[in-house]
Amino acid sequence: MIHQNLAIMIIILPLVSSVINGLFLNRIDKKLAKIIAISFLLLSALFSLIIFCDATLVGKIIHIKLLPWIEFRNFKVNWSIYIDQLTSIMFIVVTFVSSVVHIYSLGYMANDKGIIRFLSFLSLFTFFMLMLVSADNFLQLFCGWEGVGVCSYLLIGFWYSKESANKAAMKAFITNRVSDFAFILGIITIIIYNGSANYKDVFLSAKLLSNTKILVHFSILDIICLLLSIGCIGKSAQIGLHVWLPDAMEGPTPVSALIHAATMVTAGIFLVARCSYLFEYSPIVLQFITIIGGITCLFAASIAIMQSDIKKIIAYSTCSQLGYMFMACGVSSYNSAIFHLVTHAFFKALLFLSAGSVIHSVNEHNIFKMGNLINKMPITYGNFLIGSLALIGIYPLSGFYSKDLILEAAYSSGSFMFIFGITAAMLTAIYSMKIIILVFHGKTKLEKDVFEHAHEPTKTMNNPLILLVAGSFFSGMLGYYLLSMNKPNGYFHESLFNLHIYKLLINHTPLYIKLLPMAVGIVGIVIGICLYKDSLPYHDALTNKSNKSKKDWIPQSNYKMILFIPNILRNKYYFDEIYNYLIIKPIHCLAYLFYLGDQKIIDRFGPNGFARVINYFCALTCKIQTGYIFNYALYIVSFIVITISYFVWKSIY
């Protein structure tokens, strides 16, 4: 009973905090509002830790049916809380990272008049994510799924007077509606063919659905899994539907940390892992997920190399790491996908918040305009370095364990995407070193006053990052231990499912494959150092500068070819331009045609035209009503003459 109450409190506390601060304390007592927001999140994190320890040591599953929600004939759905090992680890990630972001925001948003509204939105975001991961049915999960989408819209567009923020919020919301439409169709298909939305019932019928063919090569389950995976592709910003993620950087930096590390983008990975019982019986969709994930991790990493905005580089890094997680799910290594999700949450939040400290200090996003901040911000530099090395996958940091496990799984499965993953690992090291060198080690390009006043952030912003540093160090070792438990899928043995034919013999992976990711990362570090040292002649080509003396050694014809690839990467493979040309402009043209049809034809000859005729006759009637007796006498005489003439004409003919 105690654990059940704790489980309820974990989810309810962020909601209560959001409601109290948003509705009551926003304009009354801001100090009390801050205390409530932070204390409620810390309590939620503490209770999550208790539940996690219980799930780890005892293996206990908590299932609470709170109230009946939908009842229609034989179709019943309860509003419930379901906590197993997968949910408990997600609770830890969401509540701990969210708590850090809340505390950090007190310093980062200290001078913002809307800070209480901001904290209210953050708490609401946390609540919906907790609802999503604790659901025991697809309809309740969908409520959390849409909830985080709405909150992302509110937070990305938090500075609503900023036009770019409004556009970014709309872009994120609309892009996710595209994938969510497929997700809704998937849930509807599940309900139609299974008669239930509860996980347990749906998972038990997976094998039967896989044998129910609707096309020659496709089963009902294939269609369901494909629709669900499209929903996950949009939410987790995979290639094609990734375009909203970089623009989400228009919101405050703490929002970026929360969206990219612990909440919205991880929802897609969580759903694929939760539905492993379905996806395992749909090998064709698993192959599709593997390809999407592999392409995304390489595609996003290549774009990150040529970006200049520090937050957008980290955003594309997130997109790339999510590709790794998708690839892991595609090769049935769901445990390594969740493992990387956990480790990534800590070091990516650390990177974003450290970047926020830099931006807060120098009020600049362009890394080519920074430089030599190591002496001004040594603590921030240390935090950023730890986060970057964890991202690259250097031992003994957490990324070494989780990313390598994914690549080992891809190799063991025989997937060609292993090559993509290894290449992306090298690119990850290159763009990580790019940030470190240009922001902290390069020659400063900041104005003298700005550089002299650069400083470490307040303790409110710095101290919470200690938790993320600890997570970046120790979550990898702890996770590796939990996954090494003598059970299928290790710690997640009751949450995840693998068919025997898809189990990966990772223990038999050659040693050189195990060491290859870190070796490639080290090579990438060396390349990054070489590329971004000012003395090298091709540095200017890569940084979009024009220094003729340094490019004279390259033939002019070849120089344009060399710049061709960087220009493609700098423009993000022209995805935005292609979508604008193929989708946005045609929709605008179609909308204009509908406008013409509605305003110029239907309204003109319909209600507006009829109204004009009425107005004309009304005006004519008004002219007749002059008020003079001689005019009325003339009308009467004229009418009598016309009437007599009519009868005379009729009698004659």
From Swiss-Prot:
The keyword Membrane belongs to this UniProt entry's keyword annotation: yes
GO terms of biological process kind: ATP synthesis coupled electron transport; electron transport coupled proton transport
Disulfide cysteine pairs (residue numbers): none
Its EC number(s): 7.1.1.-
Record's bilayer topology term: Multi-pass membrane protein
Main location: membrane
Record-level GO cellular component terms: plasma membrane
Subcellular compartments: Cell membrane
Reactions that this protein is recorded to catalyse: a quinone + NADH + 5 H(+)(in) = a quinol + NAD(+) + 4 H(+)(out)
Top-level class of the enzyme under EC nomenclature: translocase
Gene3D superfamilies: 1.20.5.2700
One Pfam family, short name: Proton_antipo_M
Single GO MF descriptor: quinone binding
Domain of life from the UniProt record: Bacteria
Keyword entries, A-Z: Cell membrane, Membrane, NAD, Quinone, Translocase, Transmembrane, Transmembrane helix
Residue ranges crossing the lipid bilayer per the database entry: 8-28, 35-55, 89-109, 115-135, 138-158, 178-198, 214-234, 253-273, 285-305, 313-333, 336-356, 377-397, 418-438, 465-485, 511-531, 577-597, 629-649
Entry function: NDH-1 shuttles electrons from NADH, via FMN and iron-sulfur (Fe-S) centers, to quinones in the respiratory chain. Couples the redox reaction to proton translocation (for every two electrons transferred, four hydrogen ions are translocated across the cytoplasmic membrane), and thus conserves the redox energy in a proton gradient.
Family membership noted in the UniProt record: Belongs to the complex I subunit 5 family.
Name of protein: NADH-quinone oxidoreductase subunit L
Species this protein is from: Rickettsia typhi (strain ATCC VR-144 / Wilmington)
